[in-house]
Amino acid sequence: MALYSCCWILLAFSTWCTSAYGPDQRAQKKGDIILGGLFPIHFGVAVKDQDLKSRPESVECIRYNFRGFRWLQAMIFAIEEINSSPALLPNMTLGYRIFDTCNTVSKALEATLSFVAQNKIDSLNLDEFCNCSEHIPSTIAVVGATGSGISTAVANLLGLFYIPQVSYASSSRLLSNKNQFKSFLRTIPNDEHQATAMADIIEYFRWNWVGTIAADDDYGRPGIEKFREEAEERDICIDFSELISQYSDEEKIQQVVEVIQNSTAKVIVVFSSGPDLEPLIKEIVRRNITGRIWLASEAWASSSLIAMPEYFHVVGGTIGFGLKAGQIPGFREFLQKVHPRKSVHNGFAKEFWEETFNCHLQEGAKGPLPVDTFLRGHEEGGARLSNSPTAFRPLCTGEENISSVETPYMDYTHLRISYNVYLAVYSIAHALQDIYTCIPGRGLFTNGSCADIKKVEAWQVLKHLRHLNFTSNMGEQVTFDECGDLAGNYSIINWHLSPEDGSIVFKEVGYYNVYAKKGERLFINDEKILWSGFSREVPFSNCSRDCLAGTRKGIIEGEPTCCFECVECPDGEYSDETDASACDKCPDDFWSNENHTSCIAKEIEFLSWTEPFGIALTLFAVLGIFLTAFVLGVFIKFRNTPIVKATNRELSYLLLFSLLCCFSSSLFFIGEPQDWTCRLRQPAFGISFVLCISCILVKTNRVLLVFEAKIPTSFHRKWWGLNLQFLLVFLCTFMQIVICAIWLNTAPPSSYRNHELEDEIIFITCHEGSLMALGFLIGYTCLLAAICFFFAFKSRKLPENFNEAKFITFSMLIFFIVWISFIPAYASTYGKFVSAVEVIAILAASFGLLACIFFNKVYIILFKPSRNTIEEVRCSTAAHAFKVAARATLRRSNVSRQRSSSLGGSTGSTPSSSISSKSNSEDPFPQQQPKRQKQPQPLALSPHNAQQPQPRPPSTPQPQPQSQQPPRCKQKVIFGSGTVTFSLSFDEPQKTAVAHRNSTHQTSLEAQKNNDALTKHQALLPLQCGETDSELTSQETGLQGPVGEDHQLEMEDPEEMSPALVVSNSRSFVISGGGSTVTENMLRS
């Protein structure tokens, strides 16, 4: 009894659910296996005020949907095709139960409850107890629904009973969640790919400022949220984002329209269905808001509600996504066969006919056939059509031609959703076929068991659907992934206005391959696109104008990232594309061009051989080498002349060789620096200069020691010979070699490409490795130069031909000036000028040394040969000896006078302070009558005229002073064939000064030829005072002797010999000889 009651309860519930749909709102046919279907035959329902004062009535569906009816027809066509096919489910018949969802969740749930209730009744096996005459088989799978929001509600209910649901148009990514929607599958791609494709299109057209509108349901919200994520990754900014629905009130619609009208974004992304978007489009059309580009999701990209000719000035040029079109052979003919009298199992045919031909079908002979008893239910609970607008239409004849009317129903050129429906039915049929052909032991269930096709249950079909794999009629592989999604691609369509009938047509302008590599997924044929206003030019939808190549986008504070200012790339960076977000840095050896659009190779700069500056320095260096070689050649050719001998020939040769090295070392600083030139140039320069200065130092110090030595002994001759001189030069140079060796071993210099000095130039320079080592190298050179300068300055009063002191002093001054100036110049320059400064310093110092030390001698050798003689050298030496002796005499005379003054002084005459070079024509001592009166010799008497003394005119007698005057003294000195006479005059009585002549070292005295016979060379004689007219010969002195070449004169100890010069009462005197005149002022200096 309990089971019987339960049977009637469930049967009543099923009957109520079925009766909610009138006979004209169902399509149903018997079969061995029943498939359910949910299709939007209407776009919505009429809103009624449910005050609950009477029994609530089922809502009335309004606004017929021709596309929805075509989708329904696709399901029926697929079932009939399968039933007639011997390959699929032979000996079995598929039936169907199809309901109208009216594009609402409530109507969809009514139909779903009917499926669930009928399945529950069937699962109880109540037929034997209930004796039900009208048994309705279970619905083992449901095809539908359309909208994602509707499918979400249906899937939640069907999933409780594991009834498979295969949707043909619900693309929301939320439905991929298998934890929530266990039995949901679909033959349409996931919206996640569609959102990515939308972002790719916006990026393709270089838009970055868009608005978004989404349906306020499970389709629009997830879709637009995914789009925001993709847009953010591509730096696409969203100006506004609004939610709408077909039930939005007027105020909400007005507010959204105001936002669209005031926005500067011209591209609007819409994730919505046609019914949800329609109210908004109508208001935009009313306000005539044009110039917008609509980016349509698949749900409304081909919606007949929006694609209306009267809306084209607003929605024309829309870019939308369409599912890949499929081919259904025979479907066109099937659509044309629809007729209310022939389609006995399709309760929707009557309304379709009336809506197509705008007429009204009467019941009876002329009307449609009575519905099948299987569809008959409680009419009072069904939808009442008495209030339908069709009641006021003209009567239909039933002879109307469906092919003569243009409706979306007959638009089968691009079968997208219809093909998805077709594919969904075939998917279920192939799952049933797998069950039908299952071999025990290989099945999908426990122990490889198989389901019974005659008693198959919904959950068993779901299991086989998840493992489905078959080939469609188009040759494509059909299989569902773990999320129940079917792989698929999108076609990109563009809304055009047909020139033939003025309708909106959808032209395919590209495609989007979901599974291609990133960057290769999107293809668009720009030439086929027609934009809003029939324009072919891509619209501008950016917050800011494009930043051209050479600039980058700069963020404006407080504005979205898409609102930016164009900032020029800094030097050294470039951008070669429009709207670059950042400038790329040029490689190290490159620099940005003037427009910063690309990088060009940096200019390589170094002190080149071919540039004017390098050529000039090279010419000066070559000139220095040539001059040095010329001087060396002159010295070698005239090596036996007195001047060359007097300058120490061997050291001079070595000095000239070092100068050649100095000039040559400057060439290592010119040309592109290489590692080997960098390692060689500083040591070559340092060692060459140290060798040069060492030669000058040893040479100058040797002459100084010889002339200042009181007794030149064999010790001097031994230790100041050539061996010691070269040893000292080597030791001084060896120290520099050690410094260079340590430098090259610890931190060797190397070539270096300097990018930091100037942006557009690479300076190839030498990195010195260690500035400290360079400092030691130059410092040691300067130390030797300072010592050399000290000795040169100390020997500045030596005989002119030995002395090179004046010129050495000048050369050292030049050397110090050059290198002192070099330090700040070196520190303040960079690049190739560093090498140039050092080359200039090397050349200047080298030329200074060469000119000061050698040019004067070369000039005498070549142009003044008369001065390059033994006599000239000896006279110069004699002048130096006289000068030293006279200075000593004057100094001692002053000391004696100071002592006499301290004892009371004398009554002599005032000393004369004038010294002149004149002949003594008056005898200053009249009281003494000389035996012979002679005229004094001229003060500057050359060796030649010294042999032929001029006769002296008689002196004029002068009155004798009362006091006794000292005698006048005249001394003669013989040098070989020359005679030098000097005179001393005394005017201070009773004063005696004694001076000893310093020992001298006469070298390089050549024998003079006299009648082809060698004359003996005689040394300097000691000076003695005698009578006025006395003449001392060399024989009387006993000190004469030959002096050979490079032979040193041995002198007695001055303390044991007679005074060299005795001057009595000395105050005023003149010493002349050898072309020189020594005065009192000179002796006092």
Swiss-Prot record:
Phosphorylation at Thr-889 by PKC impairs coupling with G(q)/G(11) G-proteins, while it does not affect G(i)/G(o)-coupling. Phosphorylation at Ser-893 by PKC and Ser-900 by PKA promote plasma membrane localization. Ubiquitinated by RNF19A; which induces proteasomal degradation. Residues 891-899 are annotated as: Arginine-rich retention motif. Residues 23-189 are annotated as: Ligand-binding 1 (LB1). The extracellular regions of the homodimer interact in a side-by-side fashion while facing opposite directions. Each extracellular region consists of three domains, LB1 (ligand-binding 1), LB2 and CR (cysteine-rich). The two lobe-shaped domains LB1 and LB2 form a venus flytrap module. In the inactive configuration, the venus flytrap modules of both protomers are in the open conformation associated with the resting state (open-open) and the interdomain cleft is empty. In addition, each protomer contains three anions, which reinforce the inactive conformation, and one calcium ion. G-protein recognition is mediated by the intracellular loop 2 (ICL2) and the C-terminus, which contribute differentially towards the binding of the 2 G-protein subtypes G(q)/G(11) and G(i)/G(o), resulting in distinct CASR-G-protein interfaces. The C-terminus confers selectivity for G(q)/G(11), while it contributes less to G(i)/G(o)-coupling. The C-terminus adopts opposing orientations for G(q)/G(11) and G(i)/G(o)-coupling. Residues 638-649 are annotated as: Intracellular loop 1 (ICL1). Residues 856-1085 are annotated as: C-terminus. GO terms for biological process: calcium ion import; calcium ion transport; detection of calcium ion; G protein-coupled receptor signaling pathway; intracellular calcium ion homeostasis; JNK cascade; ossification; positive regulation of cell population proliferation. Residues 1-19 form the signal peptide. Residues 543-613 are annotated as: Cysteine-rich (CR). Residues 881-901 are annotated as: Interaction with RNF19A. Spermine binds at residues 239, 241. Phosphate binds at residues 67-71, 416-418. This is Extracellular calcium-sensing receptor. Glycans are attached at residues 91, 131, 262, 288, 401, 447, 469, 489, 542, 595. Residues 950-960 have a biased composition (Pro residues). Residues 893-938 have a biased composition (Low complexity). It is a multi-pass membrane protein. Residues 638-649, 700-723, 791-806, 856-1085 are cytoplasmic. Keywords: Calcium, Cell membrane, Disulfide bond, G-protein coupled receptor, Glycoprotein, Membrane, Metal-binding, Phosphoprotein, Receptor, Signal, Transducer, Transmembrane, Transmembrane helix, Ubl conjugation. It is found in: Cell membrane. Residues 700-723 are annotated as: Intracellular loop 2 (ICL2). Disulfide bonds join 61-102, 237-562, 359-396, 438-450, 543-563, 547-566, 569-583, 586-599.
